[in-house]
């Protein structure tokens, strides 16, 4: 899980979602998981 100021999709399987006011990237590649913070 990377914590970044700006989250971007890395591959085409990445999806930007908003969960409890936190912007996240979910992907089937676990290295692409990101959270805004």
Swiss-Prot record:
InterPro entries: Ribosomal_bL36, Ribosomal_bL36_sp. The keyword Ribonucleoprotein applies. GO terms for biological process: translation. The keyword Ribosomal protein applies. It comes from the Bacteria. HAMAP family: Ribosomal_bL36 (MF_00251). This is Large ribosomal subunit protein bL36.
């Amino acid at each position: 899980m990377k914590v970044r100021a700006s989250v971007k999709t890395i591959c085409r399987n990445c999806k930007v979602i908003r969960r409890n006011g936190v912007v996240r990237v979910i992907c089937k590649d676990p290295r692409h998981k990101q959270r805004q913070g």
